[in-house]
Structures are given as structure tokens and as C-alpha cells.
Amino acid sequence: MASAFRSSLKLRASARLPAVRTITTTPRLRAAEKPYFPNEPTAPKLATAIPGPKNKAASEQLNEVFDVRSLNMLADYTKSVGNYIADLDGNMLLDVYAQIASIPVGYNNPHLLKVAASPEMATSLINRPALGNFPSADWAHILKTGILKVAPKGLDQVFTAMAGSDANETAYKAAFMYYRQQQRGGPEKEFTEEEIQSSMLNQTPGSPQLSIMSFKAGFHGRLFGSLSTTRSKPIHKLDIPAFDWPQAPFPSLKYPLEEHAKENAEEEQRCLQEAERLIKEWHNPVAAIIVEPIQSEGGDNHASPAFFRGLREITKRNNVLFIVDEVQTGVGATGKFWAHDHWNLETPPDMVTFSKKAQTAGYYFGNPALRPNKPYRQFNTWMGDPSRALIFRGIIEEIERLFLVENTAATGDYLYSGLERLAKQYPEHLQNLRGKGQGTFIAWDTPKRDEFLVKGKGVGINIGGSGQNAVRLRPMLIFQKHHADILLESIEKIIKQL
């Protein structure tokens, strides 16, 4: 195992610099732009090869007790600040991956440090409650001033959870219970003795053969139910039993969009027709569909607002619940607080799941009938974590104080324009640019994607990929135009090295 690990380190060493030296890019702080973090570096700083000697030694040590084969880098979070992530060797990288889209307001955000040091936080941490049985007296206040303060339009209730997979899993349970409740004739109808007994044998009618429909290339998590709806990569699913649930096609759009409007509209219509056919004909009745506003792990695949409005109409027409997975797209990343706000739906989704940038998790809903008809049906010991809910409240306060959703929309437009220029200059390396008008939630395809990502560290950028060929940008909400200038300059440097 040790030799295999050393081999993987050698592969990652391709990010090394020609010599061990400090390198900085040219900072271009825009005159009218005040940085949110005055103490963050003005540009990336590279002090050693990547990985450096301290990082390699620490990785070897960690490998003795923890599987590090997915390791990207070991970070020093005591020195990371704002948009910059530090490693153990003194390197400071501009982070446009942000813990897989999970850090919203910067490393070591001063306001969040105050929240973390508050007596309220200390009480939540050392007296963690079983929320379903023993919530704190201020739990309603915490929810109303935090998670529910930013609830999607029309959804005024929440079930809190631990992670994105958990949020989706519990949303599926809510959909199934609602479906059967409607079949019985309402929440007041009692279970039959046959249902009770057969459920303990995992047989019908107590364990009904129902399904959740998801989309090709979608990602919804890695638990049993959520993994059955995940369709992005085989490595996530191999050897794991899965439910017999339908998969609908997701539109495969051609770019630039303005040059392929007719073809793309036809493609979206084809996918909508197939989705409705599957709902009507699948042998296990479909209780709900789940869809990402942008397929994030599956390759940053987009569809138009008209497509999603069409999906909503299909679900209403067929009495199927509509679940929107905002785990990666939510909390401001697309230039609106929730990505589905771009769609202008006539009626809201039935449930919206969230996590990542929220630093907590759960699903929003509005219909009281989505509460199970009896207690303990949607339940676990923790049912979320008050300490994480407090952090999300602090994040919301920062977003509102600094107008970070608006910043992300404006910075995204600026960044996209710069990428359009690079795409014209280097069309073989920057293909199918997408995400216009979607904040900083931008991606493109490149034939040498993996090499591109590795070389990113060599110019001081921590950047990620998705799908087979996509480079995805997931900067924080505090990412500004002067950061975009650094990123654009760095992307051009990488391209010239390919």
C-alpha cells in the first residue's frame, strides 16, 4: 500500500514548479472595489513545489490510518483566509473549488468566528440535543431567524438533516408516505393489519413498490435511496444494490446557445416527452421526480427555465411531487439565492433540498400534508445539528450585510465575459462555455481536463472538475472582480502549458 501511495504522490508531483521559489501573479485590485477580506493575499503565493515536503510527509502519516486515495491537498486552515487556502508548506492558492462548493463567505470569516465563540454555540455543541425529542427552547427562534428566513418562496416549513444525501433521502421518504397517504384517502386513515405485518417482511402492501424518477448524469448522494437516483459515475454505484427506479434523459444542449436555439428547444421537448412517458408507464409508480437546476457532478449540464417549467407542469398533471435538489446550486452561487428562482415557476416545488454552502442540511416544504400522519415516521436521533444551524444563520447575516448574492451575479457576468474572450483565443482548450447569467456557476469542457486541474496548482489556483471533461468553477460568494482577473490570467497560463 505504501508503494502505491508513493506512486500516486509521484503523479501529483506533475504540479511542481520548475524550481522551488516564491511566485506571485500580478495583482490587479480594481480601484472601485473594496476587498471583503483586507487581510487576504493580493495574489497566490507559491513557496514550494506542490505537494511540498511537509505535505508529502503528512500525507504519508495520514495514509497509515485513513484512505487518502482521493486526496487533493492537505490544508492549513489556521492560515487560510478569505478566498485563499493554505497548505503546510506555505503555499497560498486562490480557491475556486471551495471544498466542493461548500464554503460561502471565506476561510476564517470574522463574523463566523464570533458566532463560533458565542455562548449559544458552546451550549449547542456540548449539549447536542436529540431534536425530535428534546429540542432547545429556542429552536423555533433559531430556525425562523436562520434557515427559514431564506426559505424558497411558498415553502415555510423545514425538516433539518445532516448532509445533502440525508436531505434527499428523507425527502424521498416524505414523498412515499404522502403518496400512500393520498391512496388511502387522507392522514386520518389508519394502516391495515396487512400493511403493518407485511412491512416487517419488506413486502407489499406495507413496503410498496414505488419509485423516484431522476435524470441521466444526475447526482443526489450516496446513501441507498439517494444513490439509486444518482446517475453520474459508475464508481459511485458499483457493488451497491439499487432500487428499480426510472431514469429520464436530461437535455444535452449545444453551445453557443444563441446559435442552436431550435435544436436545443427540440432536445428539451424530447426529454420532457420521455419524462412524462416514464411517469405514466413505469412499472413501479413514480411518487416524485428529483432534478438539479444544474447537474453539478455529472458535468455541469444546463437546461433552460422553460424545460424546468415544463417539468413542473408534468408533475402537476400526473400528481407527482417535484423535488428540486439545490444542494450544490443553492445559497447564492447562481446570482440568486436559490437557482430555481431563475425559472419563474407559477407554483413552487413541493420540496427543495439544501446543504453545502448552508453548512447544514435539510429540505423545505410548504404542504402540511408532507408531514407524516404519525410521529417517529420521519425521525432519527439528531435530525440535524443546532450548531450548524447557527453557522448558517451567521452565513445568512454575512450574505445580507455584504450583498453577496448581488456581488456573485455581477462578478459572474464579468468573469464570463473574460472567459468568452479566452474561448475565442483558445477554442481547442475552452469549449462549450456555459453558465451565462448564472453567477459564478460557470464551466467549460477541455480535452486535457485532468492535466489542466493539476497544472492549476502550479500557477496558484485550486480548481475542480465535473463529469468527464468539464472544468467547473465554484468560487465563494466573496469572490470579486479582482479575483476574477487573477483567475483569468492563471487560466491562460495553464492553457499555454498544455
Swiss-Prot record:
This is 4-aminobutyrate aminotransferase. It comes from the Eukaryota. It comes from Emericella nidulans (strain FGSC A4 / ATCC 38163 / CBS 112.46 / NRRL 194 / M139) (Aspergillus nidulans). The keyword Cytoplasm applies. It catalyses: 4-aminobutanoate + 2-oxoglutarate = succinate semialdehyde + L-glutamate. GO terms for biological process: amide catabolic process; gamma-aminobutyric acid catabolic process. Its EC number is 2.6.1.19. NCBIfam families: GABAtrns_euk (TIGR00699). Belongs to the class-III pyridoxal-phosphate-dependent aminotransferase family. Keywords: Aminotransferase, Cytoplasm, Pyridoxal phosphate, Transferase. One of its GO terms (molecular function) is pyridoxal phosphate binding. Its cofactor is pyridoxal 5'-phosphate. It is found in: Cytoplasm. Substrate binds at residue 222. Pyridoxal 5'-phosphate binds at residues 164-165, 381. The modification N6-(pyridoxal phosphate)lysine is found at residue 356. InterPro entries: 4NH2But_aminotransferase_euk, Aminotrans_3, PyrdxlP-dep_Trfase, PyrdxlP-dep_Trfase_major, PyrdxlP-dep_Trfase_small. Homodimer. CDD domains: OAT_like. GO terms for cellular component: cytosol; mitochondrion. The keyword Transferase applies. It holds the Pfam family Aminotran_3. Deaminates gamma-aminobutyric acid (GABA) to succinate-semialdehyde, which in turn is converted to succinate by the succinate semialdehyde dehydrogenase. Required for the degradation of GABA, which is important for utilization of GABA as nitrogen source.
